[in-house]
A protein has these predicted regions:
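Catalytic nucleophile-elbow at a beta strand-turn-alpha helix junction centered on a G-D-S/GDSL motif
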Residues: 1
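Domain-scale recognition of functional cores that engage charged ligands
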Residues: 4-256
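Left-handed beta-helix
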Residues: 144-378
Length: 378
């Protein structure tokens, strides 16, 4: 969605550190704090593996003896929307393929032998999070809750906000009472209004997942290595950075959908500080701004009371390359912002501050906000 040619985790967050750098340093800090051999293992795709491993090479202490630093997702062909045949894209054949969503983690852990290796090494539980969520730090309090809960599977949940209206939500299935996770792409058009109703569906998934290794191994073995998660049909361009390239379908599954598979699965409400996802350049702008500070423990601490609502014009800011061109001196100050909406083509100088509710609107030529400008609703 951001036109990335490499792994999103390689994007710079601040002080020259990428998502990967911060995650690696978080884990190294926790190992020292708890004197525990906490493994860090990445699920990479065929597209992200080489770049990820190159970026991690500087952290020589990161690997744990007997365990890999990565395992690979499967890959599948992208299908043309017009006839459902595999797409051909000679200018970059790699773009003919895609990973089948993060729900592939379960069969990938089995196929790679990782699940067995973790069990043989004496590990009992696994915590999984998205690499673009720097709030998902391994937390001893949540780990303790999960260990004593007896649940085979759990997801951290947060109260939904305006930013989560288009995201998935939890519900309870009437047929058997089990918790299910419904994603936007799985919701029919006539039910979209109900999906966005935050009084009806109050909680969103963080994609911070906990599971018991024994329960996962037994369930996968009973199901012949496949959990049977609901399929998600995503329509995209074969080249994410070229909106004129052919439309394709990518069939995916969601990692959190596994909650419906396990009897006794649970959700646990956590603070918003454990959910700092970067799905769009709107999110990236907030993360790079002074709304957050990077602590000595390498945790991104929110220093403003509330997160501002940011909406950048997709015609000019959707892709990271174009986004960076328009913020050449870094993100503006958003600590005192309530909302920040940008329509049109604007470039921002150094030291710009946004205060209150600000909306920029330009239907003409590109414009520039000079350095040191204070944008306010006053």
């Amino acid at each position: 969605s951001m036109g990335m040619e490499r792994a999103k985790s390689l994007l710079c967050v601040r002080s020259g550190l990428s998502f990967l750098d911060i995650i690696a340093r978080q884990v190294l800090h926790l190992r020292e704090r708890y004197d525990a051999p906490l493994p860090l293992i990445f699920m990479n795709s065929f597209r992200t593996s080489a770049d990820t491993m190159d970026a991690l090479a500087r952290y020589e202490a990161l690997p744990i003896a007997g365990l890999p630093l990565e395992f690979l997702q499967s890959k599948e062909p992208k299908l043309l929307t017009k006839d459902l045949t595999p797409v051909s894209w000679p200018r970059d054949p790699d773009l003919e393929w895609c990973p089948p969503g993060h729900g592939d983690i379960y069969p990938a852990m089995v196929g790679s032998g990782l699940l067995d290796r973790l069990a043989e090494a004496g590990f009992e539980r696994v915590f999984v999070s998205n690499s673009d969520n720097l709030g998902a730090v391994p937390d001893a309090r949540v780990a303790g809750w999960f260990a004593t809960s007896g649940a085979p599977f759990a997801i951290e949940a947060v109260p939904r906000t305006a930013s989560d209206k288009k995201g998935g939500h939890f519900a309870r299935r009437k047929a058997d009472g089990r918790i299910v996770l419904r994603e936007t792409a799985q919701t029919p058009a006539h039910d979209q209004a109900a999906l966005a109703d935050m009084t009806r569906h109050r909680y969103a998934s963080t994609n911070n997942i906990w599971f018991d290794i024994t329960a996962m191994r037994e369930t996968l073995a009973a199901r012949r290595g496949v959990l049977g998660l609901p399929l998600i049909r995503n329509v995209k361009n074969v080249d994410p950075a070229d909106r004129k390239s052919p439309e394709v379908i990518q069939i995916e599954t969601a990692i959190g959908a596994a909650i419906e598979v396990f009897e006794g699965a649970r959700t646990i409400e956590v603070g918003r500080d454990r959910f700092v996802p970067v799905k769009t350049t709107n999110d990236l702008l907030i993360l790079r701004s002074d709304v957050y500070q990077l602590g000595k423990d390498f945790v991104m601490d929110q220093v403003s009371e509330d997160l501002p609502y940011v909406e950048l014009d997709a015609d000019f800011y959707k892709f990271v390359v174009e986004f960076d061109k328009r913020f050449p001196d870094g993100a503006p100050s958003l600590r005192k912002a309530t909302s920040f909406k940008v329509d049109g083509d604007w470039t921002f100088g150094h030291g710009v501050k946004v205060v209150g509710d600000v909306e920029l609107d330009s239907e003409t030529t590109a414009q520039r906000i000079p350095e040191g400008t204070v944008l306010s609703d006053g």
